[in-house]
Amino acid sequence: MTVVPRKGAVGIGTLIVFIAMVLVAAVAAAVLINTSGYLQQKASGTGRETTQEVASGIKVDRVVGYAPDITGDITRLAVYISPNAGSSGIDLNKVRVILSNGQKEVSLKYNYVYNATSSTQTYVALPQGNIFNDIVLGVNGTSENAASTQVNFNWSLLTGSTFGLIVLQDADGSVKASTPTLNQGDLVIIAIDVDAALGGIPPRTSITGEVIPEQGAPGVIEFTTPSTYTAHVMELQ
């Protein structure tokens, strides 16, 4: 009986299995490398977004109210805002202000209005004198069309769902009338007609609210008005 040698066949089979294992390992390694790279990029992107979300936002520095008659209600509100430290530019066109007196809650947005007849608008830079005057003297200091045109702020152009902007500090000219962007170092007043929005704010009234940017932490509004009004202009927060 003739015996056929099988050692060569076994050796070739083992080599084929080994090569197959190497190829599978190489493919698996490539998949792992690609996956880890993708996950690393996603993690980096998420980290940047989280950092921006935490660092960005609006800070409410103070809130001042105005009562034309000290025996009546507060009719106008000035909310002083600035960006949080490390915040990127904030588009004030996308900002919403929420106000509540416990019985009514309103949402307000910036609406740039220009009245050609009276040369007044809902925006002014470098205000002169009392910011609560019916007409606030100032300039269109960051206008795209005129660097220092005399254009005044008109409180009567505000409604119960809109607010205006009074720019106090804006070194880089980013807070423009139609495209206002709040950057580091800027200080802006959000002007609110609370008579139109909430029907006025009487004494002993608790007001809560937020200044909500498109991205980042909101600024908090929270105060209680005095039991009696002894001055026309009063600091509330």
From Swiss-Prot:
GO terms for biological process: archaeal or bacterial-type flagellum-dependent cell motility. It is found in: Archaeal flagellum. The keyword DNA-binding does not apply. Pfam families: Arch_flagellin. GO terms for molecular function: structural molecule activity. GO terms for cellular component: archaeal-type flagellum. Its main location: other. Keywords: Archaeal flagellum. Belongs to the archaeal flagellin family. PANTHER family: FLAGELLIN B1 (PTHR35903:SF1). Flagellin is the subunit protein which polymerizes to form the filaments of archaeal flagella. This is Probable flagellin PH0546. It comes from Pyrococcus horikoshii (strain ATCC 700860 / DSM 12428 / JCM 9974 / NBRC 100139 / OT-3). The lineage of its organism: Archaea, Methanobacteriati, Methanobacteriota, Thermococci, Thermococcales.
